[in-house]
């Protein structure tokens, strides 16, 4: 039901959140031609490019990202209002809400799995915190998929194997005769690259204890960009955890890094536990769990 939301806005939001024409066509139940026409019309009206087409994916321009940030809150409000004042006899569509830092590759896999299964869902992406999740799970017909674990809220935690594991980068000056000086590592902050913040820490803790003899590593979860992290690493101020696939993409030398295998990415699923369980919930959660378990990140 879209009697309040403009068609162009819905298509723009969907393409921003799926990054794919093929996925968007399944979500919106329309063919690719009308989607392309709407985006072309918008770009002509705005006199700005919205997306860059590359290898079957849509990369939003800076202009598109600015528009998205400004209109998304209004879109969420209108969508919630439609749900509230719509026909009461009609079953509300299940909402799948991804937090803003959830990996795009896994997000697309989940959307594809739900679409192929015939599950009718409304896909959304938004910034969340513990309070927002609590409100969503009390008032909306939704499942929130987050890269963060809010321990006070009951959730299902799914683990996805991380392809290649992660590399622990150690300052060059901490190496003696080709081996890390354990005494100098103790107490040195361990920074996380953005893609590694929601890895299962038990495996990483075990590596520090068994391999380096450090029982209480100084993990730091501050939001530090990659450039600043690499600078602190170079200056000997911190160690740095980066996924292997990111190292390959950036062409980083691993001469002064240790390989940690068996690492998994943790996904938390939040949903209204007090509501009467419905077939839609059971089916969607089972599909999401299965997809995350079988996939690699």
From Swiss-Prot:
SUPFAM superfamilies: Winged helix' DNA-binding domain. GO terms for molecular function: DNA binding; DNA-binding transcription factor activity. Residues 21-40 bind DNA. Belongs to the LysR transcriptional regulatory family. The keyword Cytoplasm applies. Keywords: Activator, Cytoplasm, DNA-binding, Plasmid, Transcription, Transcription regulation, Virulence. Disruption phenotype: Decreases expression of genes encoding virulence proteins. Decreases virulence in mouse. This is Virulence genes transcriptional activator. Gene3D superfamilies: Winged helix-like DNA-binding domain superfamily/Winged helix DNA-binding domain. It comes from Salmonella typhimurium (strain LT2 / SGSC1412 / ATCC 700720). The keyword Transcription regulation applies. One of its GO terms (cellular component) is cytoplasm. GO terms for biological process: regulation of DNA-templated transcription. It is found in: Cytoplasm. Positive regulator for the plasmid-encoded virulence factors SpvA, SpvB, and SpvC. Pfam families: HTH_1. It comes from the Bacteria. Residues 1-61 form the HTH lysR-type domain. InterPro entries: LTTR, Tscrpt_reg_HTH_LysR, WH-like_DNA-bd_sf, WH_DNA-bd_sf.
């Amino acid at each position: 039901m879209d009697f309040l939301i403009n068609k162009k806005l819905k298509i723009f939001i969907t393409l921003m959140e799926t990054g794919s024409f093929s996925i968007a066509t399944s979500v919106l139940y329309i063919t690719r031609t009308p989607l392309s026409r709407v985006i072309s019309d918008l770009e002509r009206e705005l006199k700005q490019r919205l997306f860059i087409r590359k290898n079957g994916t849509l990369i939003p321009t800076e202009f598109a990202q600015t528009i998205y940030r400004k209109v998304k809150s209004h879109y969420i409000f209108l969508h919630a209002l439609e749900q509230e004042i719509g026909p009461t006899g009609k079953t509300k569509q299940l909402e799948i809400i991804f937090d803003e830092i959830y990996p795009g590759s896994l997000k697309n896999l989940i959307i594809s799995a739900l679409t192929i299964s015939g599950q009718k869902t409304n896909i959304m992406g938004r910034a969340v915190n513990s309070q927002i999740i609590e409100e969503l799970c009390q008032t909306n017909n939704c499942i929130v998929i987050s890269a963060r674990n809010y321990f006070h809220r009951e959730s299902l935690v799914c683990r996805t194997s991380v392809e290649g594991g992660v590399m622990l980068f150690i300052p060059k000056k901490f190496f003696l005769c080709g081996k890390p000086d354990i005494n100098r590592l103790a107490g040195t902050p361990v920074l996380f690259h953005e893609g590694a913040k929601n890895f299962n820490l038990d495996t990483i803790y075990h590596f520090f204890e068994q391999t380096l003899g450090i029982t209480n590593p100084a993990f730091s979860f501050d939001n530090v960009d990659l450039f600043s992290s690499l600078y602190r690493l170079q200056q000997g101020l911190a160690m740095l955890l980066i996924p292997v696939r990111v190292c390959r993409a950036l062409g980083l030398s691993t001469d002064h890094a240790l390989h940690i295998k068996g690492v998994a990415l943790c996904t938390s699923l939040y949903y209204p536990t007090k509501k009467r369980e419905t077939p839609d919930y059971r089916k969607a959660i089972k599909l999401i769990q299965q997809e995350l378990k079988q996939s690699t990140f």
